[in-house]
Amino acid sequence: MAARLGNITFDCDDALKMAAFWSAVLGRPLDKGSSEVFASIGGADAGRKEPAWYFNKVPEPKQAKNRVHLDLVNPDPAAVDELVQLGAMVTGQHQIPGQHWTVMEDPEGNVFCIANKAFTG
């Protein structure tokens, strides 16, 4: 069996705030009708090439560190500063020969990384 990634879904406290943050990060617009309860990016695009992003308001708070996180790629050194201006927080920086990445948290504390290039091998 082979499956493909169709959507990325976040449980969150404020769906609109989270969707607005990720919309700015990804350079993709919010879908019409997005609200504090449910918001989406790319969900209305039937012919999409990238996964849709969904944000659902849930009553319970985040309890622990993510067991899965997103790895973003942007070679521009200014990308980390731009993410901080959008509301992200830097929690760590790492480097190996030819590769560097910054560990960050989005406005609701979900961990993600941004690297200068995609990880290989």
PLM features per residue range, with description:
Residues 98, 118-121:
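A short acidic/small-residue loop/turn micro-motif
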